Amino acid sequence: MQIAYSFKKAKVFLVLILFNIHFIYSGPVKPKDPILRLAVIGLVHDHVNWILNRQKEDVKIVGIVETNKKAIARYQKRYSLSNDLFFDSYESMYKTVKPDAVSAFNPTKEHLDVVRYFAPKRIPIMVEKPMATTYKEAQEMAELSKKFNVPLLVNFETSWYESTYEAKKLLETNSFGSLTKMVFNTGHPGPQEIGCTPEFLDWLTDPILNGGGALTDFGCYGANIATWLLNGETPLRVSCVAKQSKPDRYPKVDDDTTIILDYEKKKVVIQASWNWSHNRKDMQIYGSKGYVNCKNAKDMILMKNEQVGEKKHIPQPISEAKKDPFRLLYEVVYKDVILEPYSLYSIENNLIVSKILSLASESSKTQKTQNWK
């Protein structure tokens, strides 16, 4: 019995030794990645559902700034948001929660106010497209970002599309020849028609708060992608026809707009409308030897040889940061990711976008082509 007892003690001792050896040589426990403590600025942009619906643990909403009681009640009920998340001013929210970053879902006209308040505090900022209602506002936002060395991102839905990135890769192979034309068709049947919330409609259809109608709402997509594909090249001239097809519904702003960007050796046509028969964000890119047709986020059609004809093409998968703007914001804050100049979210790109939209607006009012100055 004594021998059996001693053997058991020896086994226990051996197990303890092996455990300690494993603990010593397995190295330190890897710390958990930090959580991005995000403040949401505004609930009156229906895109806010993107962050409220997001079911990932790397980003946590720690504060919401909103004064619209109807919007607050709607989203509190839909997402079971606690009362202590809500604040009625930037200042009260900032003093209470000290967020790591802010994401703006307020009227475009108020983007500048967000940057004016949070940039001096060196809080990274992401706003919804477009960057601003005027080029002058966009310039001030860019200057504040540079002065305080704080990231400023502009979020477009098409920046999450696999087809968008695949199109650039295909163009860089030169297998479609030299680029000659790009056509962007963006929009939907109309904000009222698709059921936008009243709070969203109030400012989306206001020429001051939104900077225009379909021109700014959907003209920005084509300008953004074209600027990226052309590596920051600017057009020589901007022409625009902005119409009111439904003045009874949208009496203050345009609802069906065509923008033409004239470059030295190529042309870009942007058809931005609240009068399409269906939702669409598609683009056709034409080269001297063929074309790339991005029908939506994932479906593509290519043609390199007319005799062979068209063929379907499946885009390559993209990284999580490209598919998810909030993951990109996380990596900008915690992984020191720096946006490339003229990339889709970048200030450089969106300054050009803002100037294009401003010149397009002027062209539609004067009925004259505007030169790039």
Can you annotate each of these PLM segments?
Residues 224-299, 327-339, 359:
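Contiguous beta-strand/loop segments that form the cofactor/metal-binding neighborhood of enzyme cores
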